Amino acid sequence: MPPKKPEPKKAPEPKKEEPKPAPKPAEPEPKKEVEFNPASIKVEFTPDQIEEFKEAFSLFDRTPKSEMKITYAQCGDVLRALGQNPTQAEVMKVLGRPKQEEMNSKMIDFETFLPMLQHISKTKDTGTYEDFVEGLRVFDKEGNGTVMGAELRHVLRTLGERLTEEEVDKLMAGQEDANGCINYEAFVKHIMAN
């Protein structure tokens, strides 16, 4: 047997670097909500308007000596009595996000309330007829201008500014047809007329 020829030495293969994992996508920074500062709001109401607001505010004053103060819990009610329609989240924001237990104990005077009213009145984003119809069209599975009453009831009770069962019943009274469907264009007209 002939002697084995030594095998030529192979050049060592360069070490393959492990591929680096793809960098994590930058997480979007959570939007920092600007704290509401009543002192930064310029009150632009006329003296007559302010007098009218003061009168309405005083109707909610339950202090023993009529000190022109209301509880935090009453703030949304006063805003609504003055023609505004803020969400509960908006009311909580202008109040500085108080704890639930502070709502009935903390008080606010008229001078502090006025900038809050100004802010709410300037930022209100009232939906138009078209906005509401477009929003309900999402639930129109047949494309025939109607939505299922049961589905609309569920949405009104569980999404956004949730309504109570009684509020939903009042809102939908006489709106459903024999099949339990609601013509949503007529429904929006009905809501906006009230």
UniProtKB/Swiss-Prot annotation:
Which residue stretches belong to region Disordered?
1-39
GO function terms (MF aspect): calcium ion binding
Q: Where is the composition biased (Basic and acidic residues)?
A: 1-35
Q: What is this protein called?
A: Myosin light chain 1, cardiac muscle
Q: Which residues form the EF-hand domain?
A: 48-85, 127-162, 162-194
Please tell me one Gene Ontology term that the record gives under cellular component.
myosin II complex
Sorted alphabetically, the keyword list is:
Motor protein, Muscle protein, Myosin, Repeat
Among PROSITE patterns, the record links this protein to: EF_HAND_2
Oligomer and partners: Myosin is a hexamer of 2 heavy chains and 4 light chains.
Q: Which cysteines are joined by disulfide bonds?
A: none
Top-rank taxon, per record: Eukaryota
- Which residue positions does Blocked amino end (Pro) occur at? 2
Organism annotation: Gallus gallus
